[in-house]
Amino acid sequence: MKWTTDKVRQTWLDYFTAKGHLALPSKSLIPVNDPSLLWINSGVATLKDYFSAKKTPPSKRLANAQICLRVNDIENVGFTSRHQTLFEMLGNFSIGDYFKEEAIGFANDLLVNHYHLDPKRFYITVYQDDELTFNTWLKHGIPASRIIKCDRDRNFWDLGLGPCGPCTEIYYDRGERFDPHKVGEKLFFEDIENDRYVEVWNIVFSQFNNDGNGNYSELAQKNIDTGAGIERLVAILQDAPTNFDTDIFLKLIGIIEQHCKHKYDTNLYFKFDQKLNEAQSAFRIISDHFKAITFTIAEGVLPGPNERSYIVRRLLRRALLACKKLDLDLKFIDPMVDAIISVYGSYYQQLQGKNQVVQQAIWKEVTAFDKTINLGLMLFEKSIAHNALQPQVAFQLYETYGFPIEMIKELVDKRQLQVDWKAVEQLMEQHRLISKQNSNTLSFEKQNEHLVNFKTASEFLYEANEITAKVIGLFDEQYQPVQKLHNQSGYVVFDQTVLYATSGGQRYDEGYCINHSQNDQRVSFQGVFKGPNKQHFHFFLTGSFQLGDKVILVHDGKWRQLVKNNHSLEHLLHAALQNEIDPLIKQDGAFKSAQKATIDFNFSRALTWAELERVEHRIRQIIQQDIQREEIFTDLEGSQKLNAIAYFEEEYSNHELLRVIRFGDFSVELCGGTHVEHTGLIENCFITDYYARGTGRWRIEIISSNETIAAYLNEQNGKLSETINSLHNTLNNIANPALNKQKTALTKQLNHFHLPQVITDLRKCQALLNELKITVNELKTEDFKWKQKQLAEKIKQELLELAKQDKAYVLASFAAVDPKLLSQVAQAVLNQHKNKLFVLLNQFNNSPSFMLLGQDVSKCIQLLKAHFELKGGGSNNFFRGSFNESVDVSKLQAILDTLQ
């Protein structure tokens, strides 16, 4: 096969690299610091910060092949030619560099001269007011008869706020084979859904800024954002009927065929056998969904009940139901996962080595789903009424139990039931609206032209503590440039600074300046962040500055040292996890401040504390070895030769000078943060916490320095002392004589409990005290049962004594007695005095209540209602309720006397 998917991808990247673009690796499917998206769903989604000017791109020309996931049209997957959940998006991007004419030229050149597509089959859409784009296509030989001018709905990309602009789309005519009704060009010009005219490329010209009120202004930095779905392009180049008939899909479908009696027919597109189409759809659903499942689990999202985890669960369950249609032997699962990782792993390196993790997670969910199907079928059978199924039940089967709509319809048809499918669709639509955050839209922030245009150079000095600096930029709180500020809040930029700006998970430096030009005013900074052109913006709440002012700039040396300790410690923790637990563990988020460091990572199971202590011990060894820090400046190729760890959320130019931080052979990472000069300065480390951040995602919190650890130990000892005192109080309140021996032994153990003097003893002491706490609580429970028994006997004797009176009722008042206990005791006494009515008042949990047991309960209720407002409920011989007012016992007794 001439054009494989790998070749199509590489041709794209090679072409744009030759045109001066930096080819970026595919990012994780899980968005980084972007709560607006559940998954990365387009090639540009990972580049939002560059387009909004929050971050400076490593190159003004970028290209990528990005793995994407969309699940808003999941019901269509398997039944159309091109709908998929997981797909690759090819893209080229210009950030303040080339614009319309060059972007169109690249697209035309690549498609015609490199992919060798016939330009006579090109059909183009342009925005109706975009004459430049229309004329540019004419220059490339596309006749006006194959260019359509469209309105805003079709050819203007606008999210209502922020960067926006017109777009142009390239369609390719696949010929009459894909036009069975011979409709012709009308399909394209009237935008009718079809398989003949296929969109292969969309180019967005981001040239305006929408202020949110429909007012448009020219962007300071005009951008190009393009996208071409690789599966569509491959289908055209391979002359495949659908995306599912291309090389990678056919390889996966071949594995399915080996485990079932059905066969996939690549020519079925041109046939009309509905029964065969059901089997075809099953092949497509399984192959598509298993690709998505493999990628998501490999990135640490395991099937589960919430958010991303629920999407993975739903995909797997839909695939498993498709397996049932083929009577597919589930032994296909392991070779399917192996094949997916094999065909994609060379480019998408996050898959490498994840075979077993993915397979184990799938099999665990398969077992769980067997039970779920049975529960769903039980719900289905139980919910049938009057030969109908309620829409809410159909939706519940779909949403909660993972039954596809087609399966529900099969169940309904077999039982000849009536269902209001329109109501079901309305419920599904409501659910889709709630889940809209995963739809195919992006929310770019408003581009700030003042920050973009501010390009005066500023330098960060890593090692200096105090410097003289000059004010080169001044902005108010709305980022508007100003000449001066007087006792106001705002942002100041200096020609050089010693204050680190928040980035790479490291918090900004604490610091201040002395402004000689403003009567030596001291101004403290409450934040430092990087602007789009890499200058450090210093935020202040109250200060006076003027452009050109000279200041003394100082950072807090103690703060900086603690941050350096913790940042270097985070690197060592990352390396220790890889060395001691699993070499495939990768940091997936980190935070470093003066107080602590944290690291997030994905792993298939929880680590034990024994494993964490092994990691801790390894780090301490590295600290004790006092390894010198090496700071190496090299290019991307040089850093790769050093095996330096880089992260998906960072992009690095081939020609950019990169900073590598190395501690011997133990840790080598690309990093722009501040670090200790040698590991001995970290002094010590201690893991303070470890917990789940979601399914398969974990966080470790760790501290450093003897002073910080001593303070932490002192704090924990305070908590241990509080626990010891609390346990002593519990033991002192135990009254059961039978427990005296155990009580004495536990009291002795608590008296001899020694608080840890060194941090390495803390966990052992915490575990020991926790065991004592469990034992004391068990004793407390036994004592409570004994006290309840004693109380029950006391109440019983009191009621028996009252029952001897020559009255039709027994009236008694109690305080703080468990209503359940009171009811049980009263019932036992009632069994001996069946002709009595028991009226029991009780003040429990500060709530006055009453209880009636025995004969004439209903008669008594009517009598009481005539005198009091009350509420409650019960049966013929039992009532429990409360009065809406305080009740005088003597008055109540007088009323009850009338029952005689």
Swiss-Prot record:
InterPro entries: aa-tRNA-synth_II/BPL/LPL, Ala-tRNA-lgiase_IIc, Ala-tRNA-ligase_IIc_anticod-bd, Ala-tRNA-synth_IIc_core, Ala-tRNA-synth_IIc_N, Ala-tRNA_ligase, Ala_tRNA_ligase_euk/bac, Thr/Ala-tRNA-synth_IIc_edit. Consists of three domains; the N-terminal catalytic domain, the editing domain and the C-terminal C-Ala domain. The editing domain removes incorrectly charged amino acids, while the C-Ala domain, along with tRNA(Ala), serves as a bridge to cooperatively bring together the editing and aminoacylation centers thus stimulating deacylation of misacylated tRNAs. It comes from Mycoplasma pneumoniae (strain ATCC 29342 / M129 / Subtype 1) (Mycoplasmoides pneumoniae). It is found in: Cytoplasm. This is Alanine--tRNA ligase. Its EC number is 6.1.1.7. It holds the Pfam family tRNA_SAD. GO terms for cellular component: cytosol. One of its GO terms (biological process) is alanyl-tRNA aminoacylation. Gene3D superfamilies: 2.40.30.130, Bira Bifunctional Protein, Domain 2, Threonyl-trna Synthetase, Chain A, domain 2.
